[in-house]
Regions:
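Conserved beta-strand termini and adjacent loop/short-helix elements that scaffold enzyme active sites
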Residues: 36, 172-174
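A short alpha-helix-loop-beta-strand transition element characteristic
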Residues: 84-86, 133-141, 167-170
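Rossmann-like dinucleotide-binding cores of NAD(P)H-dependent redox enzymes
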Residues: 1-44, 48-54, 114-120, 128-161
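Extended hydrophobic-aromatic, low-complexity segments
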Residues: 75, 171-172
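Conserved small/polar residues in nucleotide/adenosyl-binding loops
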Residues: 175-179
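A short helix-to-beta-strand connector/capping loop
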Residues: 29-31, 101, 167
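FAD-site-proximal beta/loop scaffold in flavoenzymes
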Residues: 57-131
Length: 179
């Protein structure tokens, strides 16, 4: 089995140490990873990839394409309401309110993390705002979970994001063996 990933690491939005641990676990199980690579062609012989300007053929009988999701904004009628859109979804404020004062947006249509935990929290914030309860969306407080074996999860900014922002921090990590 081969995984072709355009990013420098699998699970690019997660902590690099966590992503590397998961990749290492799957390598032990015989999965081959091609990072910083992209698929050029899928043909009868297999998959042609490009990495660092060089092409290579990966022999394959079957191919699973999993390249992410995109908010489906067609046929929703947002144009009739003059709702402002961004490149990846509907523009919302910290209360999940769109540019139309009576329309709120939650879930995949907002173009954020597109995870169930995010959609649930966005919905809570929207309902609270509609009811007059003070609440604001903070994506740093929403967990991200990947249901692999082993499962991985995280919440908050990654160590890399904190370093890049110049924010001081104290890092602690636990594996299932130390809990």
């Amino acid at each position: 089995m081969h995984v072709v990933e355009m990013m420098p690491e699998v699970l690019g939005a997660m902590d690099k140490e966590t992503s590397g641990m998961l990749r290492s676990e799957y390598q032990k199980r015989g999965v081959n990873f091609h990072l910083n690579a992209k698929v050029i062609e899928v043909g009868k012989e297999g998959v042609t990839i490009e990495k660092e300007g060089k092409t290579a053929l990966i022999e394959a009988e079957k191919v699973l394409v999993s390249v992410g999701r995109k908010a489906n904004l067609s046929q929703v009628g947002l144009d009739k309401l003059n709702i402002e859109l961004l490149r990846n979804g509907v523009k919302v404020d910290e209360h999940m309110q769109t540019s139309h004062p009576r329309v709120y947006a939650c879930g995949d249509i907002t173009g954020h993390s597109m995870l169930a935990h995010t959609a649930i929290r966005e919905s809570e914030v929207a309902v609270n705002h509609i009811l007059g309860v003070e609440d604001r969306m903070n994506y740093d407080c929403v967990p991200g979970v990947v249901y692999t074996n082993p499962e991985v999860a995280g919440v908050g900014k990654t160590e890399e994001e904190l370093k890049a922002s110049g924010i001081s921090y104290h890092a602690v990590s636990y594996t299932h063996l130390t809990l």
